[in-house]
């Protein structure tokens, strides 16, 4: 059981949501698939706020073993405390226990036929005439695994895409630094609603409170700041905006990480290789959210990989079907979010307050173009920021 085989149709590197969904779909459609995970336990370390979209859309039952809270919307809170409620439409979802959820996705992949190897570090890949040699340190032993297709799902610090000549590394200005406490004894505005705080308290980012059953994820994401994310987060815990609600809060876990928020990478396919998930920039530049997007793109990559094996064609041209599919569905929304992020980062606290005062207090969805018209009508001085959206 410990030993790896000499060859596979598909090798997926990284057992996060993108990698597990890719390997699941590849195996389900007949490809001999290996899923490699560098950690000794799938799902650790946890690096994010753990919010996911409707799992039913992926054919996944929201099992109580990993679902901690149902989410029906969120509060957008301006520096002056003005609250805008976003509720209904596509805002519902779940907060999950990532340690359990990620492992569930991997188990699902294993049940579809994937071989899984934890504590497996890929030290390099080498192009061959018909695929790649993948160099793996698995539980201390060295292996060379031959494969026809590599799927790089190895996260924001992806090396696999770089080995293959596909640029995936981001500059520090494209990485959102995140810090988060999981805390008990937190009083939320609503136990089924997320809370988002903006302004100078979290430069070029936001602070979040996400309900998680008996606990709450209290976190921050910032970009290119003079201080550490944890410093801003600690200051927020005593901010008047949350006065009386975090006074008795007790941390039970602390997490740090980075989110790629510079938009998707230019090329996600080459001969015998595809890139997916954080490694591909499959993350909203505006919100930093990417679990659902990565799961969806992972399914696409796994499907195309299996088709490629059946067709005995692993060329860039054939694998480009994957890139075409994810770009048709997600590229424009991601680029819009990148534009919105750029605008948001330029706004002062006074301008954020003016925006909150200019839009309805209750929204079913966030249509930025329509909101921009209302904002400028009530606060003409903001036209310089929003003229591209009107």
Swiss-Prot record:
Gene3D superfamilies xrefs: D-Amino Acid Oxidase, subunit A, domain 2, FAD/NAD(P)-binding domain
Catalytic activity from the UniProt record: a 2,3-bis-O-phytanyl-sn-glycerol 1-phospholipid + 8 A = a 2,3-bis-O-(geranylgeranyl)-sn-glycerol 1-phospholipid + 8 AH2; 2,3-bis-O-(phytanyl)-sn-glycerol 1-phosphate + 8 A = 2,3-bis-O-(geranylgeranyl)-sn-glycerol 1-phosphate + 8 AH2; CDP-2,3-bis-O-(geranylgeranyl)-sn-glycerol + 8 AH2 = CDP-2,3-bis-O-(phytanyl)-sn-glycerol + 8 A; archaetidylserine + 8 AH2 = 2,3-bis-O-phytanyl-sn-glycero-3-phospho-L-serine + 8 A
Cofactor requirement: FAD
One Gene Ontology MF term: geranylgeranyl reductase activity
Pathway in which this enzyme or protein is active: Membrane lipid metabolism; glycerophospholipid metabolism
One Gene Ontology CC term in the entry: membrane
Gene Ontology biological process terms from the UniProt entry: glycerophospholipid biosynthetic process; membrane lipid biosynthetic process
Signal peptide location: none
UniProt keyword list: FAD, Flavoprotein, Lipid biosynthesis, Lipid metabolism, Oxidoreductase, Phospholipid biosynthesis, Phospholipid metabolism
InterPro entries associated with the record: DGGGPL_reductase (IPR023590), FAD/NAD-bd_sf (IPR036188), Geranylgeranyl_Rdtase_fam (IPR011777), Geranylgeranyl_reductase (IPR050407), GGR_cat (IPR054715)
Listed PANTHER family: DIGERANYLGERANYLGLYCEROPHOSPHOLIPID REDUCTASE, GERANYLGERANYL DIPHOSPHATE REDUCTASE
Functional description taken from the UniProt entry: Is involved in the reduction of 2,3-digeranylgeranylglycerophospholipids (unsaturated archaeols) into 2,3-diphytanylglycerophospholipids (saturated archaeols) in the biosynthesis of archaeal membrane lipids. Catalyzes the formation of archaetidic acid (2,3-di-O-phytanyl-sn-glyceryl phosphate) from 2,3-di-O-geranylgeranylglyceryl phosphate (DGGGP) via the hydrogenation of each double bond of the isoprenoid chains.
Protein's recorded name: Digeranylgeranylglycerophospholipid reductase
Organism: Methanococcus maripaludis (strain C5 / ATCC BAA-1333)
